[in-house]
A protein has these predicted regions:
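A glycine- and charged-residue-rich anion-binding loop/surface
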Residues: 1-327
């Protein structure tokens, strides 16, 4: 997640020195599909007002433009990368402004334009990629279970969760949710390799790749597919094999607006952490109920409560309230 600096930076960024950077350098190159570490050069530095500066002192926040960068800029629902400039700064977030890939940093040492630096993407990237690939499988599973009328209406992919909005006229039943969840997990177990291709937009559409409605695409697009299960136009980062996703668990299904539903889910380490939290809650419940079978214990308690209520009701009606024996 990025800092308050970016969340409140809309007006500032509108007046930023991006045009000057574009004219001087053009768009910088993203190499993060293949590389998570790189040696790069600082082309430009921007302060909190998005204005060009020659340097950032230690302890300051600002934006950095590298000549080449492994940091993915937030796009297509996928959060921006974090990481570090080795020995120099923590990378808090990465965003795209007018085609420029810029990283928000908090410096540990001074940074200057022209510095040669080493960049490392943080470990969250791998988890984000797993959740992004799981989102593609979820989309495919929804179309398989509910029908091909399903169309993506929005998404958000982070390292510990995913959210997928889609067109559908009514809430999913428990059975439908289970079918979707099971199908995604079955596909994960097949261990299909991911395949990425860059092709002409029309060629991609003819190949059966799913494109987002009303989305503007370049003439050449990136197509991500997993076996014969999923094929979508996507610029995000993904696993190399779907078994890297681990397990997949739907945590919530809800409505967003008329005709739009939302599924929230977790996979990989986040799914394991969720399972552990469920287990901890179950053990706590067993301790509280003094029973190894909490469901039966709850049913027994409900029966006892009903019996006591009946006793109380009868006592009130007979005028014997003061002499109730509840044992």
């Amino acid at each position: 997640p990025y800092t308050t600096l970016f969340r409140s930076s809309g007006d500032k960024s509108a007046k930023g020195d991006f045009k000057e950077l574009l004219e001087k350098f053009g768009e910088n190159k993203f190499i993060g599909y293949e590389e998570l570490k790189s040696k790069s050069k600082i082309l430009a530095l921007l302060d909190e007002e998005f204005k060009n500066v020659d340097s950032l002192d230690a302890g300051k926040e600002g934006w950095v433009m590298f000549d080449v960068t492994p940091f993915y800029a937030q796009s297509g629902g996928q959060c921006g990368d974090s990481g570090k400039i080795v020995g120099k700064a923590n990378v808090l977030d990465t965003q795209k402004f007018h085609g420029l890939n810029l990283s928000l940093v908090k410096t540990n040492a001074a940074l200057k334009v022209g510095d040669e630096v080493e960049l490392e993407v943080g470990s969250d990237r791998a988890e984000t990629a797993r959740h992004h690939s799981a989102t593609h499988l979820l989309h495919a599973a929804l179309r398989s279970v509910l029908g091909t009328h399903i169309a993506q209406a929005g998404s958000n992919v982070e390292a510990d969760r995913l959210r997928f909005d889609f067109s559908h006229p009514k809430a999913l039943t428990s059975e439908e949710i289970s079918k979707v969840e099971n199908l995604v997990n079955e596909w994960i177990l097949t261990g299909a390799n991911a395949k990425t291709q860059v092709m002409e937009l029309e060629e991609a559409k003819k190949s059966g790749a799913i494109a987002l409605f009303n989305e503007k695409y370049a003439d050449k697009v990136r197509v991500v597919s997993f076996g014969d299960v999923s094929k979508e136009l996507c610029g995000g980062t993904h696993v190399k094999n779907i078994d890297e996703i681990g397990s997949f668990f739907i945590t919530k299904e809800s409505g967003v607006s008329a005709g739009v539903r939302r599924i929230e889910a977790v996979c990989s380490r986040a799914a394991l952490n969720l399972a552990r939290s469920f287990r901890a809650e179950l053990e706590e419940l067993k301790d509280e109920l003094k029973s190894t079978e909490p469901l039966n214990a709850v049913k027994k308690l409900k029966g006892e409560i009903k019996g006591l209520k009946d006793k109380l009701k009868n006592a009130k009606s007979s005028g014997e309230l003061a002499f109730i024996n509840v044992n």
